[in-house]
From Swiss-Prot:
It is an enzyme of class 2 (transferase). Keywords: Nucleotidyltransferase, RNA-binding, rRNA processing, Transferase, tRNA processing, tRNA-binding. It catalyses: tRNA(n+1) + phosphate = tRNA(n) + a ribonucleoside 5'-diphosphate. Phosphate binds at R86, G124, T125, R126. One of its GO terms (biological process) is rRNA processing. This is Ribonuclease PH. Its EC number is 2.7.7.56. The keyword Zinc-finger does not apply. Phosphorolytic 3'-5' exoribonuclease that plays an important role in tRNA 3'-end maturation. Removes nucleotide residues following the 3'-CCA terminus of tRNAs; can also add nucleotides to the ends of RNA molecules by using nucleoside diphosphates as substrates, but this may not be physiologically important. Probably plays a role in initiation of 16S rRNA degradation (leading to ribosome degradation) during starvation.
Length: 240
């Protein structure tokens, strides 16, 4: 029995609320159970210096956690004067994931910056950030098109992410903190809406796990991503 009472192949209660911020070109509050991440997309009509003149755009991301998003307060990284390795890893992952489904030539020389702020953390913050950021990115690009500054569809597919793990030897979908902190193995899967693999991050926490167990995790992830993509579509439909 999972701590939450969920079936092994069940996601947490997922809510993707688009248009959450009135200022950003695109935004989405992604709620994966008790994990809440605000994702905003901002359009900058310039690209990094190393890309100028190349005729291509760029999509990048920043990630951060509010001091009391966790059980005990954590100092802001700005107060420490540097980002942690974990923060840098996660924001690079978010950027890579979104670029994998964006036709950078079609958007022209603009940069879209995704800001992912964890309001409350209960496991799976990076997966919530990726899933919500895609919704925010889509919104921003749609608004860009309406202004006559670009042409859709620069997004080639959906992208979403979910975690899976082995808890007491059983493969389970979408780990919360209680499961993630005790899992024998866990993995984050970033997949496209058509089933393409963008990135898989997997770790054995106690002892190696078998290939057959990994395939169980992958099958769960594929099921979860299918459901998340359906929620992304529903979120965008609610804006029309």
């Amino acid at each position: 029995m999972r701590p939450s009472g969920r079936a092994v192949d069940s996601l947490r209660s997922i809510v993707l609320e688009p248009g959450y911020s009135k200022h950003a070109e695109g935004s989405c509050m992604a709620r994966f159970g008790d994990t809440h991440v605000l994702c905003t997309a901002s359009i900058e009509e310039r690209v990094p210096g190393w890309m100028r003149g190349g005729g291509k755009g760029w999509v990048t991301a920043e990630y951060g956690m509010l001091p009391r998003s966790t059980h005990t307060r954590t100092d802001r990284e700005a107060a420490r004067g540097r980002q942690s390795g974990r923060t840098q890893e996660i924001q690079r992952l978010i950027g890579r994931s979104l670029r994998s489904v964006t036709d950078l030539k079609k958007i022209g020389e603009i940069q879209i910056r995704l800001d992912c702020d964890v309001i409350q953390a209960d496991g799976g913050t990076r997966t919530a950030a990726i899933t919500g950021s895609w919704v925010a990115l889509y919104q921003a690009l749609a608004r860009f098109e309406k202004l006559g500054l670009g042409a859709l569809p620069p997004l080639t597919d959906h992208v979403a992410a979910v975690s899976c793990g082995l808890c007491d030897g059983v493969a389970v979908l979408d780990l919360d903190y209680a499961e993630d902190s005790t899992a024998q193995a866990d993995a984050n899967f970033v997949l496209t809406g058509t089933g393409g693999i963008v990135e898989i991050q997997g770790t054995a926490e106690t002892s190696p796990f078998a290939q057959a167990q990994f395939m169980e995790l992958l099958a769960l992830a594929q099921k979860g991503i299918t459901e998340l993509v359906a929620l992304q579509k529903a979120a965008l439909a609610s804006l029309r």
